[in-house]
């Protein structure tokens, strides 16, 4: 049964005290797969507040970071068409792609070159822009996880203007974790599996899809798992539950965000997602193709699909789209193999002002979160081992 009922009634200090009183016989590595969780962990200083034998590992929780270069190339090319207005969530503007220095390497640079690119905060803004510019084609470059895809689906289901097209780059979160746990391989590309003993599942995704989406981590891999919200109190409650499960040998899925996350999730949103979008194999930047991890518009909504409406067959850049820039360790950071300050470029060539890799661009990227949180000391001692065997907090 859940260990953290009425968790919101305890303060962060109360939860820390409870955790410190636990008798942990060995180190416990806890993976998070949400940029919001990593931001709270870093800003609240939870790594240094917790006992030394509890390790918190940032994982694949940033949709901007894993958005394929090919999709960004497509968005740039469309934006440079004078008959098109491209709308996009703001954190995609500065994501760089691999091109020669003299060529456009981000949507921000395309905008500076004259492209009509407009940052938006919600899908309904895309609808409003399309309605007020009937003489233009509006392309909505929509990248994100389930929480973002649900309102995109709702926008289309409600009836979008004919001049609105969607360049979709949506992903599901759980298949990435399943891939990590299963084999450490994606589309034939092998990598070092992260070492983790438990999982903190993202509360916002569970709000839409239901906490049950993460039951497989318990059933198939016997790992303690807890859904958490975004306050220090909710995360600490999840850590406490996970640690108790580990100590007592009683593994289950706990919901430490019960005030928001309900059993079964949001059934209306799920029904709309299923009607508007299909699930397919999808490429994750730096990782490879993960089965059943991507969203694409269903046949019923194909008229809104930018990929059906436009053609890129003769675009050489698109055909040669790669993954991470040379020297960039974003893939290892995303997969939980490295802390951000163990990347070879962190704080040297790569900073928020001049980012090289996508993890330094997005507000949900671990590198950007660490830098903004003041964790700027480079951990040069571990660059040769590329492991998370010890705490490397600056």
Where are these regions (language model features)?
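Short hydrophobic alpha-helical runs that function as membrane-insertion/retention elements
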Residues: 118-119, 139, 226-227
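Internal helical hairpin/lid segments
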Residues: 236-332
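Intrinsically disordered, low-complexity terminal tails and inter-domain linkers enriched
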Residues: 185-190, 380-393
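Active-site histidine-anchored catalytic micro-motif
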Residues: 132-142, 147-202, 208
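Metallocofactor- and cofactor-centric catalytic cores in central/energy metabolism, strongly enriched
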Residues: 2-135, 149, 161, 175-177, ...
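Short amphipathic alpha-helical segments
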Residues: 43-44, 152-154, 212-213, 240
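Short beta-strand segments
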Residues: 33, 58, 87-90, 140-143, ...
């Amino acid at each position: 049964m859940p260990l953290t009922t009425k968790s919101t009634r305890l303060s962060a200090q109360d939860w820390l005290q409870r955790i410190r009183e636990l008798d942990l016989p060995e180190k416990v590595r806890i993976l998070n797969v949400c940029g919001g969780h990593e931001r709270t962990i870093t800003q609240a200083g939870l790594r240094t507040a917790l006992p030394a034998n509890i390790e918190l590992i940032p994982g694949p929780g940033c949709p901007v970071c894993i958005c394929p270069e090919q999709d960004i190339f497509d968005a740039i090319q469309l934006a440079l068409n004078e008959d098109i207005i491209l709308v996009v969530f703001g954190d995609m503007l500065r994501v760089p792609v691999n091109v020669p220095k003299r060529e456009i390497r981000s949507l921000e640079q395309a905008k500076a070159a004259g492209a009509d690119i407009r940052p938006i905060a919600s899908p309904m803004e895309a609808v409003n822009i399309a309605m007020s510019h009937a003489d233009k084609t509006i392309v909505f470059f929509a990248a994100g996880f389930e929480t973002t895809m649900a309102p995109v689906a709702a926008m289309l289901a409600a009836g979008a203007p004919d001049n609105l097209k969607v360049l979709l780059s949506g992903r599901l979160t759980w298949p990435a974790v399943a891939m990590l746990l299963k084999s450490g391989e994606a589309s034939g590309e092998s990598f070092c599996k992260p070492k983790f003993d438990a999982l903190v599942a993202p509360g916002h995704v569970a709000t839409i899809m239901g906490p049950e989406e993460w039951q497989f981590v318990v059933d198939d891999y016997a790992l303690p798992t807890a859904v958490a919200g975004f306050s220090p109190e909710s995360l600490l409650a999840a850590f406490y539950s996970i640690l108790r499960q580990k100590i007592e040998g009683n593994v289950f899925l706990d919901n430490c965000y019960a005030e928001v996350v309900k059993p079964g999730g949001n059934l209306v949103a799920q029904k709309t997602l299923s009607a508007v979008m299909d699930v397919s194999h999808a490429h994750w930047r730096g990782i490879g193709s993960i089965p059943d991890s991507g969203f694409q518009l269903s046949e019923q909504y194909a008229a809104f699909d930018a990929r059906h409406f436009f053609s890129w067959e003769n675009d050489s850049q698109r055909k040669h789209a790669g993954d991470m820039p040379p020297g960039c360790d974003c893939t290892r950071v995303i997969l939980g193999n490295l802390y951000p300050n163990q990347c070879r470029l962190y704080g040297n060539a790569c900073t928020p002002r001049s980012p090289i890799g996508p993890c330094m661009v997005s507000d949900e990227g671990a590198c950007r979160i660490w830098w903004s949180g003041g964790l700027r000391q480079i951990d040069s001692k571990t660059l040769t081992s590329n492991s998370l065997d010890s705490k490397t907090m600056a």
